[in-house]
Swiss-Prot record:
GO MF annotations, alphabetized: aminomethyltransferase activity; transaminase activity
GO terms classed as biological process: glycine decarboxylation via glycine cleavage system
Keywords per UniProt: Aminotransferase, Transferase
Annotated NCBIfam families: gcvT, PRK00389.1
Catalyzed chemical reaction(s): N(6)-[(R)-S(8)-aminomethyldihydrolipoyl]-L-lysyl-[protein] + (6S)-5,6,7,8-tetrahydrofolate = N(6)-[(R)-dihydrolipoyl]-L-lysyl-[protein] + (6R)-5,10-methylene-5,6,7,8-tetrahydrofolate + NH4(+)
SUPFAM superfamilies associated with the record: Aminomethyltransferase beta-barrel domain (SSF101790), Folate-binding domain (SSF103025)
Name under which the protein is recorded: Aminomethyltransferase
Record's GO cellular component terms: cytosol; glycine cleavage complex
Family: Belongs to the GcvT family.
Pfam families assigned: GCV_T, GCV_T_C
Keyword DNA-binding included in the entry's annotation: no
Gene (name only): gcvT
Subunit structure: The glycine cleavage system is composed of four proteins: P, T, L and H.
Enzyme Commission number(s) of this protein: 2.1.2.10
Natural source organism: Thioalkalivibrio sulfidiphilus (strain HL-EbGR7)
């Protein structure tokens, strides 16, 4: 049976269509995925992301442990609350998962990892903690609500109380802050400004209701996926996995090769890949022909060979079909995509497609 978040009853009250996602019963939409998408781009929407896995990493060895575990380097983090996006890698250089790390002190970090990979991630993290003075604590006592959109911050601030409201109001992008049992990060997965708010599970339903009264529209997994695709943000299990390097997933920027003396899981494999060259490119596609781009469709790249779409769909903001794809190194700006057996013209672009409500590519 699927697990339920603390907001499960709220979703049922709102008439959500519920689906299984990574073992959790989650809302796909509340009536109109397109309307929910536009609400986030134009005003404010909220997502129940309580299924995400929150892990507190504490101890005198926390910093050294994370510098070994993650491809990005937590030593960059100097200001309390600052967040870092990174991948955990296999020794062969594949992606175990992507995650966000919040730096609270040299002995205290908070990690937010994906829901569908919870058990695998926790086991991986614990196995690699051997020899480090570190304690890993899963925070399954917390719920999490993401409020996103151009008016999302203001509407969230209007219903936050006391100290956490002051903390949240002062946050810069990609920084988090804590007050009591509440934690707010100015982060998200939509390409819009907003907050991701962690709070005691028992307090989540009332907070959800207050946000709704303030004019924040509930949004489901369907809108979350089209928003993150427009924002050019990777989805684990589609755009990268244990068989694919971050260097071929548009994530080279998340790998810290400096300082050279830092060893991290997967480093040697990535250095070999870099030295060998010929890495596939991770690109955006805009369909210029008919149909809708979908994952696993073949990308016909002429003399360069073939690539594959990793994520695709219709962009409600742009009114065209877009995709993320992995293509051979020598691919030109024009390609064709095999859409149901018919080659359709498409154009290579550099993601993102949309950020902060504005188109980033020519249509």
């Amino acid at each position: 049976m699927s697990k339920q978040t603390p907001l499960y009853e709220k979703h049922l009250e709102a008439g959500a269509r519920m689906v299984d996602f990574g073992g959790w019963s989650m809302p796909l939409h509340y009536g109109s995925q397109i309307e929910e998408h536009h609400a986030v781009r134009r005003d404010a929407g909220m997502f129940d992301v309580s299924h995400m896995t929150v892990v507190d990493v504490q101890g005198n060895g926390a910093r050294d442990y994370l510098r070994f575990l993650l491809a990005n380097d937590v030593a960059k983090l100097k200001v309390p609350g600052k967040a870092l996006y990174s991948c955990m890698l296999t020794p062969e250089g594949g992606v175990v998962d992507d995650l966000i790390t919040y730096y609270l002190s040299d002995t205290f970090y908070r990690l937010v990892v994906n829901a569908a990979t919870r058990d695998k991630d926790l086991a991986w993290m614990r196995d690699r903690a051997t020899g480090f003075d570190v304690l890993l604590q899963e925070r399954d006592d917390l719920a999490m609500v993401a409020v996103q959109g151009p008016h999302g911050r203001d509407k969230a601030l209007s219903v936050l109380d006391g100290e956490i409201a002051r903390v949240a109001d002062a946050l810069s992008p990609f920084v988090g802050g804590q007050a009591g049992d509440w934690f707010v990060g100015r982060t998200g997965y939509t390409g819009e400004d907003g907050f991701e708010i962690m709070l005691p599970a028992a307090e989540a339903p009332a907070f959800w209701d207050r946000l709704k009264v303030a004019g924040v529209q509930p949004a489901g997994l369907g809108a979350r996926d089209t928003l993150r695709l427009e924002a050019g943000m990777n989805l684990y299990g589609q755009d990268m996995d244990e068989q694919v390097s971050p260097l071929e997933s548009g994530l080279a920027w998340t790998v810290a090769f400096e300082p050279a003396e830092r060893d991290f899981v997967g480093r040697a494999a990535l250095e070999k890949q870099k030295a060998a060259g010929g890495l596939r490119r991770f690109v955006g596609l805009v369909l210029e022909g008919r149909g809708v781009l979908r994952g696993h469709m073949r990308v016909l790249c002429g003399a360069a060979g073939e690539g594959e779409i990793t994520s695709g769909g219709f962009s409600p903001t742009l009114g065209v079909s877009i995709a993320l794809a992995r293509v051979p190194a020598g691919t030109g700006e024009r390609v064709e995509v095999d859409v149901r057996g018919k080659p359709q013209p498409a154009r290579l672009v550099k993601p993102p497609f949309v950020r902060n409500g504005q188109a980033c590519v020519e249509i």
